[in-house]
Amino acid sequence: MVDSDGFRPNVGIILANAAGQVFWARRIGQNAWQFPQGGIKAQETPEEALFRELEEEVGLAPADVEVMGCTRGWLRYRLPRRLIRSRSRPVCIGQKQVWFLLRLVGEEEQVQLDRSERPEFDHWRWVDFWHPVQEVVFFKRRVYTRALQELGPLLFPDGLPRQPPVGRPRRSAPPRGCRRA
């Protein structure tokens, strides 16, 4: 499902433990880490999509988590041109997401990344609150920052941890004899 502007409705999940660390997962067969996320199906509410994705990708049931809050509106990111499938219809140029902050109230042993027929992730770990902004693929950084800034006060009512500066993604050097434009 893609909206009239070319954005796919989606939910993003920030799962935190009692220490204020967040769940960080590696996509299968890649060195790409991200928060769990997934599309909202037709006739599905964002909260229904949240719990479906949480079970499919992380293996947790609603009883394993406490919903602490969600973003006030959609947060959008555009895909780089090389990732846009321009031959598919409708063309999806990015995602619009409602982000949810969850606290794990069950046992972390309940996490099972292989609960679905097609798992998304092969490894996970707890990381410091701002770590995902440093490590996520560049085109998602702004959305991750906004989601963490908006939802973080629910997890840290006395003040957010200090956010380290985010560096620009490294560019590889051009081949010998080539000049950058």
UniProtKB/Swiss-Prot annotation:
Provide the Nudix hydrolase domain boundaries: 6-149
Provide an example Pfam family for this protein: NUDIX
- Residue window of motif Nudix box: 38-59
Q: Which InterPro entries match?
A: Nudix_hydrolase, NUDIX_hydrolase-like_dom_sf, NUDIX_hydrolase_CS, NUDIX_hydrolase_dom, RppH
Q: Which CDD domains match?
A: NUDIX_Ap4A_hydrolase_plant_like
Q: What class of enzyme is it?
A: hydrolase
Task: Give the protein name, as stated in the record.
Answer: RNA pyrophosphohydrolase
